[in-house]
Swiss-Prot record:
GO terms for molecular function: ATP binding; hydrolase activity. The modification N-acetylaspartate is found at residue 3. It is an enzyme of class 3 (hydrolase). This is Actin, cytoskeletal 1. Transmembrane segments: none annotated. The keyword Acetylation applies. GO terms for cellular component: cytoplasm; cytoskeleton. Keywords: Acetylation, ATP-binding, Cytoplasm, Cytoskeleton, Hydrolase, Nucleotide-binding.
Length: 376
């Protein structure tokens, strides 16, 4: 399926980033922010030919004069008009394809409401005239990308995190746990603790700078208390970062205090369990006979699992919770930022998958509810 003529399209719509490309490729061709920006003031500059909305990178680069909105909140689409703009931009500007010529594989959050799947299906067939489409659960695709069909996926992106136990390719809905703690919260927390150090970041534009600091300098400590002592007694953990205006700031214990919130949500004033405990709780909701397979196949996925040190810390924390002789293995593939997309690319190019597509004809006969019968 390497010729782009009839290749299926794979679009992973995350809360923070859209990953899009062609089935059979090993990485997405287009990765851009899931944002739609509208001008704050009508016609700031005369004769600019201002558009009424900008999507993705265009919105990002003009963020000074725009109000930015994310149509996907906590992994779930909340604004369909803006979502349509994002898809339109994906097809026509990023991938430069005619959507009516390619089957399209979309991804959805675990526990996505039924009405949402139907709406997605409807838009693909009615607005974009897709010849065929399919909706797959994000975590399941990540597991496929790691070469497994059984395991538990901890998927953490920008807007939401999930633990999803999967057995023989099927997600076990009763054991899926959702954690409203993800990249955006960690960025906000870093903004807050940098403010305590005397650096203020407040606007949406400045938040993007902080996100960059987070991605470049933060890491997860194996032993938080000990790391705090090291940071207090020496400057070995300090790193400097140059802001766009040339000012250089120094950050020390913030580097690991910030992602520590994943393990201790109380840092953010949240009462929920940390990611290690959530994983453990999710496994404990599964049948006792498959727990061994889940402990031995714990797969990390999504951009917020990219912190250095997260896998070792996860191993340590889950080992402490699990039965003493249990074999625990945390799998953290280097490309996990894109593993949902990669899994989709693998799935959509399998010869056995070709009969799974929902065709335009089936949609015309059954309507949007066809998605519940064909995608699960």
């Amino acid at each position: 399926m390497c010729d782009d003529d009839i290749a299926a399209l794979v679009i992973d719509n995350g809360s923070g980033m859209v990953k899009a490309g062609f089935a059979g490729d090993d990485a997405p061709r287009a990765v851009f922010p899931s944002i739609v920006g509208r001008p704050r003031h009508q016609g700031v500059m005369v004769g600019m030919g201002q558009k009424d909305s900008y999507v993705g990178g265009q919105a990002q680069s003009k963020r000074g004069i725009l109000t930015l909105k994310y149509p996907i909140e906590h992994g779930i689409v909340t604004n369909w008009d803006d979502m349509e703009k994002i898809w339109h931009h994906t097809f026509y500007n990023e991938l430069r394809v005619a959507p009516e010529e390619h089957p399209v594989l979309l991804t959805e959050a675990p526990l996505n409401p039924k009405a949402n799947r139907e709406k997605m299906t409807q838009i693909m067939f009615e607005t974009f005239n897709s010849p065929a489409m399919y909706v797959a659960i994000q975590a399941v695709l990540s597991l496929y990308a790691s070469g497994r069909t059984t395991g538990i996926v901890f998927d953490s992106g920008d807007g939401v995190s999930y633990t999803v136990p999967i057995y023989e390719g099927y997600a076990l809905p009763h054991a899926i746990l959702r954690l409203d703690l993800a990249g955006r919260d960690i960025t906000d927390y870093l903004m807050k603790i940098l403010t305590e150090r005397g650096y203020t970041f407040t606007t949406t534009a400045e938040r993007e700078i902080v996100r960059d600091i987070k991605e470049k300098l933060c890491y997860v400590a194996l032993d938080f208390e000990q790391e705090m002592q090291t940071a207090a007694s020496s400057s070995s953990l300090e790193k400097s970062y140059e802001l766009p205006d040339g000012q250089v700031i120094t950050i020390g214990n913030e580097r690991f205090r910030c992602p520590e919130a994943l393990f201790q949500p109380s840092f953010l004033g949240m009462e929920s369990a940390g990611i290690h405990e959530t994983c453990y709780n999710s496994i404990m909701k599964c049948d006792v006979d498959i727990r061994k397979d889940l402990y031995a196949n714990t797969v990390l996925s999504g951009g917020s699992t990219m912190f250095p040190g997260i896998a070792d810390r996860m191993q340590k924390e889950i080992t402490a919770l699990a039965p003493p002789t249990m074999k625990i293995k945390i799998i953290a593939p280097p490309e996990r930022k894109y593993s949902v997309w990669i899994g989709g690319s693998i799935l959509a190019s399998l010869s056995t998958f070709q009969q799974m597509w929902i065709s335009k004809q089936e949609y015309d006969e059954s309507g949007p509810s066809i998605v519940h019968r064909k995608c699960f």
